[in-house]
Amino acid sequence: MFRALFALFLTLAVAGSAAAQGQAINGTIEGTVTDESGGVLPGVTVTVTNTDTGDTRVAVTNESGIYRAMLLPLGGYRVSAELAGFKKYEQVGITLGAGQVAVINVKLGVGAVSEVVSVTADTPVVDLGKIEQGRTLNEREIKSLPLTSRNPYNFALLQPGVVGFETQEFGVPRLTANGALLRVNYQIDGNDNTQKDRAGLRQMPMSEVMIREVKVVTTGYAPEFGQTMGMVYNAITPSGTNAVHGQASYRLQRKPFAAFPFFTANRATKPPTDVNVFTIDAGGPIVRDRTHYFAGFENSRRDFSGGRVITISQPNAAALGLNEPAYMPSAGDTKFAIGKVDHQLSQAHRLSVRYIFFDNFISNNLGNPGITSVQRASDFTDRQHSTAGQVVSTFGNNILNEMRVQYATRSQGRVPGSQAGTGPAINVAGAASFGGPIAGAADAGFGFTENIFQVLDNVTYISGDHAFKVGFSGQFVKDTRTQTQFQLYTFPNVASFLAARSGANPFGYSNFQQFFGEPSYEYNTNMWAFFVQDDWRLSSDFKLLYGLRHDIYAPPDGVQNALVESSRGFERDANNWQPRAGFVWTLGQDRRTVLRGNTGLMYDQPLNAIYEQAIVNDGSTRRGAVTLQPAQAGAPAFPNVLAGGTAAASNTAWTVDPDFQIARMWQSNVQLERGIGELYSAALGLSYTRGYDLPVVTNTNLINPIGTLPDGRAIWSTAINANTRRDPRFNAIFATQSIAESDYKALTLQFTRRFHRGIQWDLAYTLGKSEDNAPITSTLSVQGDTGGRSDQADLEVDRGPHILDQRHTFIGSIVAQPQLDLSGVGGAILNNNQFGIALQFASGIPVNVRANRDLNNDGIVNSDRPNGVARNSLNLPARYNVDLRYSRLFPIARTFKAEVIAELKNVFNTVQWNGVNSVVTVDALGNPAAPIPSEGDMFPATGGYEQRQFQLGFRVTF
């Protein structure tokens, strides 16, 4: 009923699908000019001036009295309006943010043009031109909110409808919006910054130094934006102005500043948590009112040991012969640099060029080791470059063109850590992972290079009440990989491993995996997009945005002689048409209430790992992949491995289903927002999304099950022949299929205060529910369901909450910079103080209870659940986190200030779980040997979020 009523409402309201973040890195000022009686005034000259840089745009009102100034640089603005016979109107104090449509309505009084009516006011507290769901974190928030991680991507979690968890350094936070698991279109200045191989990965990390604003849109984005079913995260880099500004800072953390990490087995020694961060940046004019520069640099050196707790139990460590430290010793050295120039080529053409550099080294880079030994850790290097340019051109008063070009490259690799083990890697289910450091495709020996060239051009034509926009973009991606030569034994329990090690039973393992052959390969992918949209202001109270987007994905070439036919060539997905529409309706005479609605179809970006796996695991003698169970022919006796280069050893292949389609999601949203006075607003929103064609990996080679488990799951034969395998040349053929679905419903409540007298806040609550039958593996995603599908015959067995489903979330950001009208000692003490508070209260993420053995003989370990246990049926405890930043300013000269900064992560040191060891011992039918815990926190913890951390900083600004 909810779904039907929601769809009916939006269909009647807008007859289409969603959006209106019409500009990626710019903003729009628009409005209606009337006389004192309310009659519209055509022919009014409206001049829009950027008070920071001197840029000027002139618009003329049409027959409906409407004017539009689009593709404006961010910053402060002055709007003036002139018409013969009327007094001149001038308004200052307008601040324009990324993607914002600032509605400035003007009322002209009769009189001489020489008479000036001056107004100082910002846009209305309720955004009358906004259609999409999302928010902009402005420069004040970016610089004032606590961020001990130095990772601005964590700010996405301060957006209503976004769930997941942050990272403690420059890694990738796990983010989900609209129930679209880990689907994020990362952008820098509107240019693509999304890594193409797996879901949830950004390419270039960002530093606070490199960001002016963050624009987060969760749904309702215009046809101009695509290649995601989730959210758009757009980081806007700073620009110089006519005034020279800059800063230099130093921040530090030390061991005494931090509490003990959560779930530490040995609390005798606190781990090192040293952090040293140096930053410097400056911006200003090269030629006043015409050419401006910005440059910045950061070097962050951090000891990660305190966040990397090893939780192998003492009895298991002793039995396995492991001597593990309490913490994974790990340290990083990270450098950022940015340079940017903005130049007004002429009155009609503006150029912006920027370059970003990133370099990173982390020793023993294993983010949350849990039961993983230091033997398995590897050292990680990562270097990136991004160069981009934008040209904005105006032709007369009604045609604008925006062109963007970008070239970005990322190169990373891993080598064994200083304490790496030798021999094959070993996993003992639920106990420990140790041995050699090469257990998977991304371990030691892994190499990755991705180059992206992007070109984009958009043309806007303003005609009457319409702003038509058409555009295209092309992305050309080249990937080069070096595949690890991994060797991995998996055992069901400690006793089985000990028996194998002693020689009593060298075949007591669950399975053995190995890869050998040519390690390096490369492939190319191309993506094209076309869109057309109309931003139609039907009246001063109602605006409709509708349009159509088309994405075309050209996958890599197949493997010409692949043994699996479907891997010889991959189908091009070219039918991705996406209708979208949205509206904003201003209600009431006081213009303080707006109703927004949007609905539309969004397509995902292609996950290149889908094709990559088929290329590298083609089943040929050129590259060999093997998965063997002990009873199968050719299975080695522990600890032996297979001799490389033998054709008989290659018994595992990957492919892409010939009917594979790019995933898509239909999103619908409605929001009612009400302004309360001049400072406050409250909003109520409802969302519903439905995902289709979600990717899952299936072993399609299994046929003729030999039995069932008590709960009905099929059991397969371990024999490999024509009666048990569709293609008896292989034990397993893993095909990526687009057969899964998702469902998401949410209610959001939001209460905001705009910045006034030194205080602003944004508070929000989301009640959401996400379900799917798409257990995505870490092969395709940065955060995956361990093992993937648990039943290769029935996908509905895996329907349940997805891995980042959080039913309740409350988030808040508060910035306070009070300035009191006091002099003397009182004024000196109470003024020049700044506070930033970030709040995150959320339900715990799901826990998937897993069996310690392969119950159905599908060759996939750690994916099966005990008999009768549903997927993700338990949850971790709720998370309550408060971060605080306090700084004290010391004015030295008119434009020179010193600042002392104190930041606290997890102020109250509340215990925060991020993972448990949920593997339970079962018999051959999946019956547990002991009662299964009824709560997620009854399992042994494998790690937590950050304990209380204190960071001290010093900064000078000018």
Residue map of PLM features:
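Periplasm-facing N-terminal accessory domains of Gram-negative outer-membrane beta-barrel systems
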Residues: 2-138, 192, 207-209
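Periplasmic N-terminal accessory/gating domains of Gram-negative outer-membrane beta-barrel systems
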Residues: 86-239, 245, 254, 258-267, ...
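Transmembrane beta-barrel strands of outer-membrane/channel proteins
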Residues: 121, 248-254, 295-299, 353-357, ...
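Solvent-exposed loop/turn elements at secondary-structure boundaries
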Residues: 152, 165, 558-578, 582-737, ...
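Short, solvent-exposed micro-motifs at the edges of structured domains
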Residues: 208, 274, 539-541, 555, ...
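Short loop/turn motifs that connect adjacent beta-strands in outer-membrane beta-barrel proteins
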Residues: 223-226, 240-245, 287-290, 348, ...
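Transmembrane beta-barrel wall of Gram-negative outer-membrane proteins
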Residues: 245, 271-361, 379-408, 579
